[in-house]
Amino acid sequence: MDAANLVMKSSMFSKSPCPVFGSKLIPRAPPSVFTLPSTFRPLVKCIQASFPQNPDSKIPSNNSTFTCSAVTSFPSQQSQPHATSDAKLQLLISEFQSLVEPMDRVKRLLHYSTLIPSMDASLKTPENRVLGCTTQVWLHVSFDEAENRMKFVADSDSDITKGFCACLVSLLDGATPDEVLALKTEDLNALNVAGLNGKGSASRANTWHNVLVSMQKRTRALVAEREGRPRNELFPSLVITADGIQPQGSYAEAQARFLFPDESRVQELASLLKEKKIGVVAHFYMDPEVQGVLTAAQKLWPHIHISDSLVMADKAVSMAKAGCEYISVLGVDFMSENVRAILDLAGFPEVGVYRMSDERIGCSLADAAASPAYLDYLKTASTSSPSLHVVYINTSLETKAYSHELVPTITCTSSNVVQTILQAFAEVPDLEVLYGPDTYMGSNIAELFTQMSTMTDEEISEIHPLHNRSSIKSLLPRLHYFQDGTCIVHHLFGHEVVENINEMYGDAFLTAHFEVPGEMFSLAMEAKKRGMGVVGSTSNILDFIKERVEEALNRNVDEHLQFVLGTESGMITAIVAAVGKLLGSADTSSGGAKVSVEIVFPVSSESVTRTSTGSSLDQNKVNIIPGVASGEGCSLHGGCASCPYMKMNSLSSLLRVCQSLPHGKAELSAYEAGRFSLQTPNGKQIADVGCEPVLHMRHFQATKRLPEQLINQILQRSSSA
């Protein structure tokens, strides 16, 4: 039947007109067929409605019904040659906001899904899939050279999602590239079309944003091609499937070579550890060769652990209790210092603790906190009362000890820093919180709280039950953070990298550590709002990736997931292991869906070797840093997404230490983590005072409340001030 003569029966009926598609209601008796001008693509609906008697009405009811047809037209580009995308958007917003009932909006969306034809099967390819939608969505984009306008074709296996696509196509099909790129995802916030409070409504709303982002990414690519401009180069990446991994780019290839280590080296290390009763605690951020060997050796010797810095000392104590006589620490110096101090406090002073280099293994963040500027920051702020110092766990015991004597101090990790600060504000009235040393994390926390101040009380209570919009607004001027502390790794995620992500990976899943610079943080926060990102710790990032993979497997359709890894690349081993396990457990042998996962490393054009001329390195006489710039701006033992300090923990150093024990202790004196003999200004042992902020944090993690001892310290210091 010709579209202009189509008659459809439906229960959908609205008293308001359809401004975008030109709806009008035509009352009539029996159904009939209308013929419209060729410039319209109409949809005629027959509606039969029965009106129940209003008990308050004085008009008697005759239980009558009436029937009418709604003619909804979809103007062609010729009929509205000057209509801008913005004007169309305002009409669309007005239309949906005029529908009070949520179900009416859903029905209108279903109605729009009938206005666009199904996409040709040849275009429903994996390359045309839109990520982040709970259903399958395809998008094909082309450029009309003659008219200098964009053309969009979209489809979905869900009628509701297809309705979303129809609305976006109606806005942007035939628009200029500038119009397409000017539309912002927040411009679509007023289009709460689904309007359902049930499970999945948020993911439906995210469809607007994810399809728009894909439209814009592909528009940029076509415009660049048309203008003859070279596009930004793709970042190196690693593709994980049930059959294995496929490296992309020289950097990812280098990483992959060590994900499956030499079995002879694995056997050699495991035998040494077992023979000499050596435990190993290692941080995520280290050389991939070492991670690969250690991960494989865990199957042969259980006393090997790879984690964030917080857990390393705890695991060392467990290993000592299990009979280990030595602990090798693969990390920076403050981590080995923490292990040494915690073992002493736990009653294991005889257990030796060894670093992996006879040179200093520094940390730019820890160095910043040990600077005179940081102590001056605390001294100035400590005049405010009451005050609490929240210090990042990745600092030395000296920093924790000296800080704690100036201002009551609690340590934090990127996983618990937000909850720690919010709980402190909730428990201590008029509290001033001083965070340090990482400037990026501090600014990101402040930005997060600023965003929270615009949320509803219900949304805020989901983050922390003791806060609301009023309390969040009141704490903002009482939150302070150090201005001169930078992690050299996360500093590299700057404007250039963010620009490349926007152009090349805007429709991918984005992950960001709390410490990354504000631009990368904001980008990930925006993606998080539409279900496409996560901001948090390394563990949060890993959990997010695993959840998205599980969802894809449950959908049981062929799918390619792409994640931008906005943190140090050393955690790729943990990601490969977790994702590989999930994909391997899926049954694809009987024709099941095939899911692949791509991990993208956003590598800056700046190399970390630039920091060799920086003050933090020169002051500490670190003359040789593994990993000079090469290839794509990074190399196996360093580079823009790898910490040069962590890469000093080489496999050869680990084997050398293990081989020298126990008889070569004298040769390893420079490797041994020494005990603190210095005292604080108040005459106390650094290890005793420095461990107290860590114990405060452990109490908070166990109880979700600040320890009473810490609160008393805050109030007593306030009274004395």
Swiss-Prot record:
The active site is at C133 (cysteine persulfide intermediate). Residues 1-67 form a transit peptide. It is found in: Plastid, Chloroplast. [4Fe-4S] cluster binds at C363, C487, C643. Pathway: Alkaloid biosynthesis; nicotine biosynthesis; Cofactor biosynthesis; NAD(+) biosynthesis; quinolinate from iminoaspartate: step 1/1. The keyword S-adenosyl-L-methionine does not apply. Its cofactor is [4Fe-4S] cluster. Its main location: plastid. GO terms for molecular function: 4 iron, 4 sulfur cluster binding; metal ion binding; quinolinate synthetase A activity. Binds 1 [4Fe-4S] cluster per subunit. It catalyses: iminosuccinate + dihydroxyacetone phosphate = quinolinate + phosphate + 2 H2O + H(+). Its EC number is 2.5.1.72. One of its GO terms (cellular component) is chloroplast. One of its GO terms (biological process) is alkaloid metabolic process. Gene3D superfamilies: 3.90.1010.10, NadA-like. The keyword Nucleus does not apply. Involved in the biosynthesis of pyridine alkaloid natural products, leading mainly to the production of anabasine, anatabine, nicotine and nornicotine, effective deterrents against herbivores with antiparasitic and pesticide properties (neurotoxins); nornicotine serves as the precursor in the synthesis of the carcinogen compound N'-nitrosonornicotine (NNN). Catalyzes the condensation of iminoaspartate with dihydroxyacetone phosphate to form quinolinate. Homodimer. Belongs to the quinolinate synthase family. Type 1 subfamily. This is Quinolinate synthase, chloroplastic. The gene is QS.
